Amino acid sequence: MKKIILALIFAYIFVAAPAQQGEMRCRLGFSYEFSSNNHWGKDKPVIMKVYPNSPAEVAGIRQNDIIEKINSLKVADITMDDVDSLLTASEDSHILLTVHNFSNSEREVPLTKECYSNLSLNENQLAAAFSMYSVEDTHDRLFFCPFVTTTTEDAIDFSQFKTFDFSLVEEDKSTLRIETVLNEVLKTELTKKGLSVNALNPDMMIHTYYTFDRNPNFRKKSKATEEQPPVFRYDITRDKVTKFPFYSPSTPESEAEYVLQLGIRFIDQRIMPGRVLWECEANELMSASYSLEEYASIHIPLMCMQFPYVKYNRNVQFILTKKAYNYTGINYNIYRINEVVSIDPGSPAAEAGIRPHDIIERIDGKRMDYTAPEFTAAYRQFITNTLKLRDSETRFTDANGFVGRMFWDSFKYSQIAKAFAKDNNLTAFSYLYAFQPFVNPERSTSCTFDIRRDGERLSVVVRPVFHSEKTIELN
């Protein structure tokens, strides 16, 4: 799906072509591409991403699943356009996929599309539209890893390989400790993909190799190397983006104080014993010492994202997508933003008694009687006026190319909260991030919606549910 630049999402929504009353938009909750890979799903759709809290995730669809059939039609017998039409047809709310992966040669997965009125705007979309209210919670971030990934030139289907085991570890205690860590991480990642350990007769043998030491060829750093921007990557062990002591891959090796190499080989034991099926190698140039075990724990999951479906042969690009927000279940009218179009069944707003066609006059005392362009203009002005309250040390370029993404300065939370409280900033939708102290210093767990219904004014207290989503995908 084509990405819309986040800072313009809100404006974009309201300049799109008018939706027809009663029309619906639906989603299954995954993206896919047609494979040209001889080892996985050749000429068939392969699932590239499964969206959090979507029908696909609930049904158990997984990344790298190969779609074999749609509503019992074999994808090999229809065109790419037919596949697109069958998956996106708005008149069909139910669909039956037959998928293929390591665990199953074929598995039928019934899916029910999640459908909304074309007139509605949900809180997931609003969280993205107002992401600068809390970049800490909602952003897309691009990062690179210097991996080189190669596969056998033989046209062999990797799904034939179901089991694995590890090469014998060395007797040396320090090496045994390192390989134990590497093998445990690999075991976790491969079992997630549906493979299993078989020590007696494995289909694949996994071999790891590694080195880490001071660089014997180090001479002197140039000014350009000393002034390189820091390298940030996602640290799965800490669940956050972290700064690492790595240099750019283009740095001359003689200017790096330390070097690290980590490689993984999957070796055929089933069809042609000894043949290397898949290999991924990381080579890092480093400015400081770093634990090989820690490197492996963070980077092996990223390396394994290219098995069995390889997209990049070198310098792999990843996107971390993070979104956390307060969910009430209210869906707003795109063209009359303070009108409720619908309420998600069983949601906090439904339980509190908010109904479709209610007019929201205020949220936590903040007025809602403005047009969408007025909200958009005020949001942009808010971003400009509060730049001085952000921490410049956290500046990063997001996955859409915006260079000025920054977190709030933790020493200025009281000033930030005052900016959110100003009436002329039109920050009613900051309730989406009211769990943060820079939005809501009292950290209250409820929101008050002042509504108008058939001429009657009501005050309704809603207790939102915290929704959190995070995905890492190949770009």
Language-model features and meaning:
Residues 1-24:
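Bacterial Sec-dependent N-terminal signal peptides
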Residues 20-22, 83-126, 377-470:
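PDZ-domain C-terminal substructure recognizer with occasional recognition of PDZ-binding tails
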Residues 20-49, 86-88, 297-344, 350, ...:
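PDZ/PDZ-like peptide-tail recognition elements
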Residues 22-23, 38, 209-273, 432:
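Surface-exposed short loop/turn segments
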Residues 42-43, 59, 120-181, 335-336, ...:
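A structural "domain/chain start" motif
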Residues 56-79, 349-379, 383-390, 417-420:
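Conserved PDZ fold ligand-binding element
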Residues 104-105, 114-153, 276, 283-335, ...:
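C-terminal/domain-edge helix-coil "capping" segments
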Residues 163-222:
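N-terminal segment of the mature soluble domain
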